[in-house]
Amino acid sequence: MKKMKLRHIIIAALCIISTSCVKQKLETTYNSQENRIDQYIEKNRVVGGDTLRVVYNDGSSRLVTKEGEGPELTANGNIAFHYAGYTFSGSFSKSNLFVTNRVESATESGWTLTDEGSQILTINMNDYRLLPGLKAGLIGVKGGEECQILFTGKYGFGNKEFGIIPANSALLYK
């Protein structure tokens, strides 16, 4: 009986240790992704002598490549936009495209879009389809603004694989 209890205690302890190690590894992965995002922003922040504006919001980083005009998008507002989503591993690569409605991005990556596939997306910011990192990155954009929004896997698809996107992948949206 004592051996049985001891065995259960050891198994429970091993499970706790294993879970703790997995969580620590995941946090290390996200910290590494945050560092790569910061390095990417620093490397791409100055263009033609001009310093681009960077906005940080709830785990998301927005590098503004063209300023917009008018009122800022709110957390409950509606937005209509073209986009291209890429997995991000420290640098931008056209081959990492996983979704787009931008003809230019599709063409650059060797994709073909139908007329329907290139339609501008109109969506409410509370729509469940928006990833937390994308939503946080869009808050505050103005009409006509062009930007890159980057965030870790924690604010993307998390530990779920999604189509061709590996679990816990950092993402970049243009």
Regions found by a protein language model. Give the residues of each.
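Sec-dependent bacterial lipoprotein signal peptides
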Residues: 1-21
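Cross-family detector of peptidyl-prolyl cis-trans isomerase
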Residues: 5, 21-174
